[in-house]
């Protein structure tokens, strides 16, 4: 039987999904991050498949989303996008420490994955935590600074004035530089990393992520199988079942 528990640690709500017989055992941990305007329970199908394979799956609630949400228009929420991502990276560490303290992680076998904003978060977290043993980015991007600059350019092209002091913009830019994997690919340390991206994606651009993959392939020359990019020529911003199953398979192989 698969158990689903709604828990909270240090103010972070999350769903904890695991086989009943593994509830108090040390097993591999996979943290899966949801996308923008989504919520933790929207990825229960992925967590179920992970739990079936013997993993402990954890689905955190991102700041300003789901049960942490507020009455906020999408446009207003978008203004908090990078704060949400950077906060989520910090909270991933809190969750890891919790399960580690409880003795529920098997030998440091920890994986991280996410869709869209969750994929972006995953790639940033790889710059922060060397204990992440394997990662999967579904429709994500490592190019934090480039994406942020594109957002600013888009707003300005619409004739909209950015109601934020330039000093704060530059402060955020510096914070993003610290978590921009495209600026420090050596932090991957040849860890297993899978990308899935739809070529017709108009939300998170396909080309920059593909370019990053092509750039880092040389880092994996000794173990090329540990780096994979699946580009779906017919897909847009929606993860198909095949990509979900590949995610499960990736963690089965590398955790």
UniProtKB/Swiss-Prot annotation:
Give the EC number(s) listed in the UniProt record: 3.1.-.-
The encoding gene: yitV
Q: Which UniProt keywords apply?
A: Hydrolase
Q: Specify the protein name.
A: Putative esterase YitV
- Highest taxon above the source species: Bacteria
Key word DNA-binding present: no
Q: Name one GO molecular function term.
A: carboxylic ester hydrolase activity
User: Any one Gene Ontology biological process term?
Assistant: proteolysis
- Keyword hit for Hydrolase: yes
Looking up Pfam families in the UniProt record yields: Peptidase_S9 (PF00326)
């Amino acid at each position: 039987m698969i158990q689903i528990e709604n828990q909270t640690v240090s103010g972070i709500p999350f769903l904890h999904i695991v086989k009943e017989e593994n509830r108090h055992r040390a097993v591999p941990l996979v943290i899966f991050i949801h996308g923008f305007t989504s919520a933790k329970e929207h990825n229960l199908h992925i967590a179920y498949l992970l739990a079936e394979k013997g993993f402990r799956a954890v689905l955190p609630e991102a700041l300003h989303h789901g049960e942490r949400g507020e009455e906020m228009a999408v446009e207003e929420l978008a203004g908090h996008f990078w704060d949400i991502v950077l906060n989520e990276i910090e909270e991933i560490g809190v969750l890891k420490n919790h399960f580690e303290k409880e003795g529920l992680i098997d030998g440091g076998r920890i994986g991280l994955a996410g869709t869209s904003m969750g994929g972006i978060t995953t790639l940033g977290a790889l710059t922060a935590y060397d204990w992440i043993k394997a990662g999967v980015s579904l429709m994500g991007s490592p190019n934090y600074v480039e994406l942020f600059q594109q957002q600013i350019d888009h707003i300005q092209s619409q004739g909209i004035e950015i109601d934020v002091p330039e000093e704060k913009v530059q402060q955020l830019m510096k914070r993003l530089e610290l978590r921009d994997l495209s600026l420090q690919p050596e932090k991957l340390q040849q860890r297993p990393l899978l990308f899935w991206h739809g070529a017709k994606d108009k939300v998170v651009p396909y080309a920059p992520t593909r370019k990053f993959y092509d750039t880092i392939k040389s880092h994996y020359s000794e173990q090329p199988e540990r780096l994979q990019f699946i580009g779906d020529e017919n897909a847009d911003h929606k993860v198909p079942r095949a990509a979900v199953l590949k995610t499960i398979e990736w963690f089965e192989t590398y955790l």
